[in-house]
């Protein structure tokens, strides 16, 4: 080991609980959420925009593009090509064990993220690739990636040698060519705002949303986001 860092206030959250909690809070503030509602087209409409969706057309004066790996597809509807890609990766969960790891373990050199959930199951990841399937939004588990990921995890936490796996699931994460977020108003498309954070969307989502809300409301964002404008990709 060449070096390490310890962050005593490093946090972790269960997205299966955190995401519905955010949605419930938004509804209490007046938001209307349309689940499983795909945007199939987006175009200027008078002084605003019109989105064609599975629930019918929706008109809005302002649009926030926070579609993750699909953000590039949405921006392309407005004639703006952004280097946003979806990458299939996978995560493994084990049976419950005694408490061993109280914090998030991040092993950059070995491609490993590892933590224990509240019920003491281990969650093992690290960006290992899943397989692409016929449906781009439905990746499949890659057995070789699973074995390689577990090899690193067992080296770092030997207790895993006697722990059974329960399941493995793949998903799509979003990335940009320069690994930087895309935030702020889309150049040449007034009223359209980007809120896209690559690779760590769940972690950075709340702050990205806060900064985006400030910009949408015409306020100066509390952090300077000029370097993250989509203008860096546009001629």
Feature names for model-found ranges:
Residues 4-25, 68-70, 145-152, 197-204, ...:
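Mid-domain beta-loop-alpha active-site segment that forms a flexible
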Residues 57-102, 223:
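Central helical "cap/lid" subdomain
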Residues 25, 29, 77, 215-219:
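Active-site catalytic microenvironments for nucleophilic, acid-base chemistry
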Residues 52-54, 95, 108:
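Short strand-coil-strand connectors
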